[in-house]
From Swiss-Prot:
GO terms for cellular component: helical viral capsid. One of its GO terms (molecular function) is DNA binding. The keyword Aminoacyl-tRNA synthetase does not apply. It comes from the Viruses. This is Major capsid protein 1. It is found in: Virion. Heterodimer composed of major capsid protein 1 and major capsid protein 2. Keywords: Virion. Self-assembles to form a helical, filamentous nucleocapsid mesuring 400 nm in length and 20 nm in width. Together with capsid protein 2, wraps arounds the DNA and maintains it in an A-form. Capsid proteins probably maintain the DNA in A-form by non-specific desolvation and specific coordination of the DNA phosphate groups by positively charged residues. This certainly protects the viral DNA under conditions such as the extreme desiccation of its host.
Length: 129
């Protein structure tokens, strides 16, 4: 047996032991990681649902006050605008606003200027799964 093959076998054995050790650690800690990630995911879902409820309630009230029909897609557009504002893409915000019917642009501007919505959205972005 040559020196090269012996060194290769030793390196292979050490690699296997290291890999098995990592797998053992991952197996024992995986339940903790799983529980933590589920809790974070539930927290994100709760915050997201609260934002959606508020947007929808405000949209329905806006439609009633203005006497215009409720636009079901306005919730998704508001989400997109909140995300774009949070990321700082002002040019993209203008592009999206041009696609929205004129009677709903004031509503979307109000949503984007609402500091409470902005703080909730930034709180949502802080929770990472």
């Amino acid at each position: 047996m040559s020196v090269v093959t012996t060194r290769a076998r030793i390196a292979e054995t050490l690699t296997e032991k290291h890999t098995l050790g990592i797998e053992k650690v991952v197996a024992t800690d995986s339940w903790r990681v799983g529980i933590t990630s589920r809790e974070k995911k539930l927290e994100r879902i709760n915050i997201s649902a609260e934002i959606s409820r508020r947007i929808q309630d405000e949209a329905i009230a806006y439609a009633r006050n203005k006497g215009i029909p409720y636009l079901p897609g306005i919730n998704g557009i508001a989400w997109k605008l909140l995300r774009l504002k949070w990321l700082g893409y002002t040019d993209q915000i203008n592009v999206v606003m041009r696609t929205v019917p004129a009677e709903w642009r004031d509503f979307l501007t109000q949503i984007m200027e609402n500091t409470q919505m902005e703080s909730m959205y930034s709180e949502l972005r802080k929770v990472r799964v």
